[in-house]
Amino acid sequence: MGDIVTREQVASLITRYFSQQISDDEKVAALNHFRQTLHELSPFTREPVDLVLWVKASEVVANDYNPNVMAAGEKKLLQHSLQEDGFTQPVVVSEEKGQYLVVDGFHRQLLGRRESGAGKRLKGWLPVTCINPERKGQAERIASTIRHNRARGKHQIASMSDIVRDLARLGWTDERI
């Protein structure tokens, strides 16, 4: 019947691999590789949260259409939360043309870039999860951002109207919007 490899043996090999003298960049690349492999085998492969990757903050690009505005007090609370609790939610992105475009989590990624607080711990990296690959393009990103913002009930009416107008100009029907 062939050799059976146990979870404990796999875990031992991974531990041995990471106990070698390798740089943080190499460790992050290996973590992302292993996570990607596990994600491909996962029964939850269609769920973006099943694969959280670490990417260089310089590869994460803010969108230019987000109608979400955060009050100073809320931003301070988010900063405190990131400092005390760490990142409990990844930045939601769309991977396009070698960049990660922010769909949700603009303020998390902004605070995660800082050289103090949580940003200092992250050493220039940000946790991201990518929206499903078929959701590529500006219209799909905008629609996803709206869904994330409206689910939280935080958005600006005028900015939301501008986005709806832009989606209509891109050929989206009222039903699709």
Give, region by region, the residue ranges found by the protein language model.
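N-terminal leader or domain-start segments enriched in small/polar residues
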Residues: 1-78, 94-95
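Short, conserved phosphate/pyrophosphate- and ester-handling motifs at nucleotide-, phospho-/glycolipid
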Residues: 105
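Short active-site oxyanion
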Residues: 97-101
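Amphipathic, charge-rich alpha-helical segments that serve as recognition/docking helices
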Residues: 63-89, 109-176
